[in-house]
């Protein structure tokens, strides 16, 4: 699997280096000597693009069945005058310049693009601004679409359910979840800028360096960032959790700064290193920003599907779905209980009456993919409205899925 990152020099003008690394497990990474770009008289490096005029380089593997082979890898990047361009490659290493996609946006953040198989079109998310309630310019996320990667729709600002707060959304991190491609997940960076120095900044880690940065712009010392989580099924309306998914963490001289928690694009299933355990999810985010050493990329882990859960205390709780129709002959769940806890699944008709033969009984354990056993034939209920009632005690339910056993 490849990783692309940007490095830059502090020369005038600065050079932006787009670098390539690769891994077979998402944990250990190799930087091959590619011989493409000359740096300080040598091509023994992992730089694939060298430019004075590009930024925000994002690469994706184009899964459009009609994509020409020599365009399988596409990159989107920002060029001067607020233009979003693309580069093209057959192997993900040797890129050539393509064409301008749009000049209707800001584009100076991480612009994400992918082929949506369900919609049969390309989807791009980028940054812009809108006027806030107090006249402040608020960073936001916009969406554009294309069927051919050349002609793009007008930007449309995404909306949020159950989140009335007008947060600054710095990056977006929107992507189809590889375990459920019909669902988008996103890891945007939330930008928070307090407008004046207070006593808390004197107590907060890194105060002296924070004051030094403010010589260049006040926000370089006053702003802090963290990572949020949100999901969507249509790509336009998102459920955004207001609480941080990735906090700045324990105070240290290199934390609690503008630039913390910027999530890299992509999620990877990685082994835990413990025999017999389910894989876990790895994702990556920036740290060590605004220091005298290079920015670092940190790997974080969580359980498969473990972004959110329905959780109940030992006293118990229930989750009842809306009526749904399913295909398949098996139900699998991702769940975790304590030793004394449990989870039980009851299938009901549309009116909420329990169906005979469809009570799982007590389930306990901690598994990302547990098949639920019923005495009844689950396939007989396919394609007719049913409800699922999950009865939990000191337990978490992360996901459930109907499937055809053996497929």
State where each predicted segment sits:
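Carbohydrate-active catalytic/glycan-binding domains of CAZyme proteins
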Residues: 1-407
